[in-house]
UniProtKB/Swiss-Prot annotation:
More details: Plants overexpressing CCA1 have a reduced number of tillers. Plants silencing CCA1 have an increased number of tillers.
PROSITE patterns, per the entry: HTH_MYB (PS51294)
UniProt-listed PANTHER family: PROTEIN CCA1, SWI/SNF COMPLEX-RELATED
Localization annotation: Nucleus
Lineage, highest ranks first: Eukaryota, Viridiplantae, Streptophyta, Embryophyta, Tracheophyta
DNA-binding region per UniProt: 46-69
One annotated Gene Ontology cellular component of this protein: nucleus
Protein's name according to its UniProt entry: Protein CCA1
SMART domains in alphabetical order: SANT
InterPro entries per the UniProt record, alphabetical: Homeodomain-like_sf, Myb_dom, Myb_dom_plants, SANT/Myb, SANT_dom
Keyword Zinc-finger attributed: no
Stored NCBIfam families: myb_SHAQKYF
Tissue specificity comment: Expressed in leaves, shoots, inflorescences, embryos, endosperm and seeds.
Gene: CCA1
Keywords, ordered alphabetically: DNA-binding, Growth regulation, Nucleus, Stress response, Transcription, Transcription regulation
């Protein structure tokens, strides 16, 4: 061992040098012959070979054997014979490098034959399995490829709404004017079947795109929640579309038949639900093409030639020829479920047959919160029941069809859950959680308030709004569009103290706001969402640390009050259509993926959250200059209860004339709701301890008449 200068031994051990003391002993012919005999007798048993040779050690014999075997292999390669054939010996297999499971596999011939047979059989079975699996995978891939191909073929854009995993999604697409003449009627039926003939589906649907085939295609797709079976039966004739749709769809008790309008290869093949079922509207395309009508109890819809996906929905069939893009005249503000949803029998069933877990969660939330429960009951009273009358779009008196759906018994829990889902979807749509496609001209619908609010006083709204005749409906809608829809929804601020804690609630809803929660009540306007009644005292949308509404908030039923979060200063300052379109584009970017949308914080929510902790004014606290006077009034009367009368039927063009006469009172809540004192409780979760602790210390006690929907921070109220 080497020693360092410090006297310590070296850490690295160096190998000892060695010298070859004796010369390499050559193998004589006799030793080699004995070696060959021992190989035939003992194979690789080196000790026995050593005993047999007698003059060589085991190490020398192994070295000699290695050289000899390599020499034999070279000779065999050169001569083309098997190794060892010249000496009639079988070269024993080499020593294994690692310890195998079976160390000397001497039965190589038998094992090789059986293994090859097993491999062939396995290959056959594996090939069958892979053929089946690849057929299924190819079927799924063919569906996806077909959908993507249809999206990208004509350059049309599609934003897909996915509330739940693999449930039918509503598609809002722009349609090119060069789409071919093709209408398809499709329905959804909950049967659990396997994927079948998907390649045939792709081939036939592509040929259907040319408008030549009228084949019946069964593309059956396993859906995870409740197995939705899609039977698409397209027909390329426009005139018989309603007839064929009513023939193809047979009414079933538990069927989920959602209308599906297919423009060949120009639209994404997703599910499109039309929302004109409750009031019996007729949808007319902006190019004056065939109206998109709903069939009674069939859920069929006729996809028409060159039809715009954002149709104007006039009040009367006389207005079908109108080609101007008008705001959506919604009769009952309680339903803005999605952008285009059939509120008829089939859409009701599709809502009711969603996930049982989601429904039970909604039921528990409704039962634990009386205010939301009361509002949902009112909304459900106007929602079509399962066995009730379904409005007929061909009726001349559309008010009868509008009243027919809610002229029955009090709503059950299923209808309440369904109406709550619709209201929540409407609120999500207006708030930007759900992607909406920006319209090419203006907003094609009024994102109307989604439910009545908790109130304690009954007052009539303006008589001119109630008694608007049917003849002036179109004129009024065009006027509102010319004035940039500033007059679409009027908010009349009257400071009246709350004298009675009970009362009936009319559709012209008055919502009472206490000083503790003076938030922006901003109804969504017709073509713009820029009309804002702004108050100084704001409630932060994310004051609890989360952008999602807690279960105690009446936000699913309070869309105009929740709309202000999505509006920043620039949007409210500008009243042009481009600003509204840009805002919708921003909503799409902020909520592009909706699979985990309840976990995401949108762009506006992040701005509001930053402004809260920097103690600045929140985005919803900015208001147009024409409302500054009302802000000062509301600040002076801080100790009083402010009554805001929201006219929900300004643009609804008053479908039910019988309810809207000047002599008769408005339709009101059910009797059991009129005596119910609506009070909301805080049952939501508290994600951040800091916010909740601070809010507990600074919370203002509220009276019985006023529900504290949000926690207000005093330092924020002073801004």
């Amino acid at each position: 061992m080497e020693i360092n200068s410090s006297g310590e031994e070296a850490v690295v051990k160096v190998r000892k040098p060695y010298t070859i003391t004796k010369q390499r002993e050559r193998w004589t012919e006799a030793e080699h012959n004995r070696f060959l005999e021992a190989l035939k007798l003992y194979g690789r048993a080196w000790q026995r070979i050593e005993e047999h040779v007698g003059t060589k050690t085991a190490v020398q014999i192994r070295s000699h054997a290695q050289k000899f075997f390599t020499k034999l292999e070279k000779e065999a390669i050169n001569n083309g014979t098997s190794p060892g054939q010249a000496h009639d010996i079988d070269i024993p297999p080499p020593r294994p490098k690692r310890k195998p499971n079976s160390p000397y596999p001497r039965k190589s011939c038998l094992s090789s034959e059986t293994s090859t047979r097993e491999v062939q059989n396995d290959k056959a079975t594996i090939s069958n399995m892979t053929n089946n699996s690849t057929a299924q995978m190819a079927g799924d891939a063919a569906l996806e490829k077909l959908q993507r191909k249809e999206i990208s073929e004509k350059g049309s854009c599609s934003e897909v709404l996915n509330l739940f995993r693999e449930v039918p999604s509503a598609s809002f697409s722009s349609v090119n004017k060069s789409s071919s003449n093709h209408g398809a009627s499709r329905g959804l039926e909950p049967t659990k079947t396997e994927v079948k003939d998907v390649v045939i589906l792709e081939r036939d649907s592509i040929s259907n795109g040319a408008g030549k085939d009228a084949k019946d295609i069964n593309d059956q797709e396993m859906e995870r929640l409740n197995g939705i079976h899609i039977s698409s039966k397209p027909d390329h004739s426009h005139e018989n579309c309603l007839d064929t749709s009513s023939q193809q769809f047979k009414p079933k008790s538990n069927s989920v038949e959602t209308t599906y309008v297919d423009w060949s290869a120009a639209k994404a093949s997703h599910y499109q639900m039309d929302r004109n079922g409750v009031t019996g509207f007729q949808a007319t395309g902006t190019e004056g093409s065939h109206p998109d009508q709903t069939s009674d109890q069939m859920g069929g819809a006729s996809g028409t030639m060159n039809q715009c996906i954002h149709p104007t929905l006039p009040v009367d069939p006389k207005f079908d020829g109108n080609a101007a893009a008008q705001p959506f005249p919604h009769n009952y503000a309680a339903f803005a479920p999605m952008m285009q949803c059939h509120c008829n029998q089939d859409a009701y069933r599709s809502f009711a047959n969603m996930s049982s877990t989601f429904s039970s969660m909604l039921v528990s939330t409704l039962l634990s919160n009386p205010a939301i429960h009361a509002a949902a009951r009112l909304a459900a009273s106007y929602w079509p029941t399962v066995d009730g009358n379904t409005p007929d779009p061909n009726q001349e008196n559309l008010s009868e069809s509008a009243q027919g759906s809610h002229a029955g018994s009090p709503p059950n829990m299923a209808s309440i859950v369904t109406a709550t889902v619709a209201a929540a979807s409407a609120w999500w749509a207006t708030q930007g959680l759900l992607p909406l496609f920006p319209p090419p001209i203006a907003f094609p619908f009024v994102p109307a308030p989604s439910a009545p609010f908790s109130t304690a006083d009954v007052q009539r709204a303006q008589e001119k709004d109630i008694d608007c005749p049917m003849d002036n409906a179109q004129k009024e809608l065009q006027e509102t569009r010319k004035q940039d829809n500033f007059e679409a929804m009027k908010v009349i601020v009257s400071s009246e103290t709350d004298e009675s804690g009970k009362g009936e609630v009319s559709l012209h809803t008055e919502l009472k706001i206490s000083p503790a929660d003076k938030a922006d009540t901003k109804p969504a306007a017709g073509a713009e969402t820029s009309d804002v009644f702004g108050n100084k005292k704001k409630q932060d949308r994310s004051s609890c640390g989360s952008n999602t509404p807690s279960s105690s908030d009446i936000e699913a039923d309070n869309a105009p009050e929740n709309q202000e979060k999505a509006n920043d200063k620039a949007k409210q300052a500008s009243c042009s259509n481009s600003s509204a379109g840009d805002n919708n584009h921003r909503r799409f970017r902020s909520s592009a993926s909706t699979s985990d949308s309840w976990k995401e914080v949108s762009e506006e929510g992040r701005l509001a959250f930053d402004a809260l902790f920097s103690r600045e004014r929140l985005p919803q606290s900015f208001s147009p200059p024409q409302v500054e006077g009302s802000k000062e009034i509301s600040k002076e009367e801080e100790d009083e209860v402010t009554t805001v009368t929201v006219d929900l039927n300004k643009n609804a063009a008053i479908i039910d004339q019988e309810l809207d006469t000047a002599d008769e009172p408005r339709a009101s809540f059910p009797n059991e709701l009129s005596n119910l004192k609506l009070k909301s409780r805080r049952t939501g979760f508290k994600p951040y301890k800091r916010c909740s602790v601070e809010a507990k210390e600074n919370r203002v006690p509220a009276s019985d008449e006023v529900g504290t929907k949000r926690i207000r921070l005093e330092s924020e109220a002073s801004t």
